[in-house]
A protein has these predicted regions:
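N-terminal cap/lid segment of alpha/beta-hydrolase-fold proteins
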Residues: 8-39
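Short secondary-structure boundary micro-motifs
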Residues: 6-9, 69-70
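Alpha/beta-hydrolase active-site loop
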Residues: 99-129
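Short, surface-exposed "cap/lid" segments of acyl-processing enzymes
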Residues: 31, 37-98
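Generic structural signal for short, flexible, solvent-exposed coil/loop and linker residues
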Residues: 14, 21-25, 65, 74-77, ...
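Generic detector of short, locally flexible boundary/turn motifs and exposed helical patches
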Residues: 9-15, 49-55, 100-106, 127
């Protein structure tokens, strides 16, 4: 199994152990990994958005996969005891090789806060609000 797939399986297990449902959502031009535990739709929801992950392998070399090796936001979401919790990965994180091939490295480097990225994460947040 490739490292990115191993990291995805590990993240899914972490989420499931906390009663969260792992899914991949289409948002804008991206596929976004999420983990959600929502017991009451009227409750406020605690939202954790992952950081940049492994954007760079060295100071001058871009990573081929931005999936974090230690997912801090996911770890916090899993430990949160609130009944409604959502974890949102950044674009291009936790994708298999085929989907990752469609994700340009600029989205985890120079364009990580571009309109396309912000729009995609906003779409996921909007879906959570419904």
């Amino acid at each position: 199994m490739l490292e990115s797939e191993q990291l995805m399986v590990l993240a899914q297990r972490q989420a499931h152990s906390a009663g969260m449902t792992w899914s991949l959502r289409e948002a804008g031009v991206f596929t976004i990994a999420t983990a959600i535990r929502r017991t009451n739709l009227s409750d406020r929801i605690h939202v954790y958005i992952e950081g940049d992950g492994r954007a760079w392998t060295t100071r001058s070399r871009l990573s081929t996969d931005p999936t974090p090796r230690r997912a801090t936001a996911l770890a916090l979401a899993v430990k949160d005891t609130h009944p409604s919790v959502a974890y949102i990965a950044r674009p291009c994180q936790y994708l298999g090789p085929a989907a990752l091939a469609d994700c340009a490295p600029q989205y985890w480097s120079s364009h990580r806060y571009s309109q396309a990225v912000i729009k995609a994460i906003s779409e996921v947040l909007d879906a959570l609000a419904k």
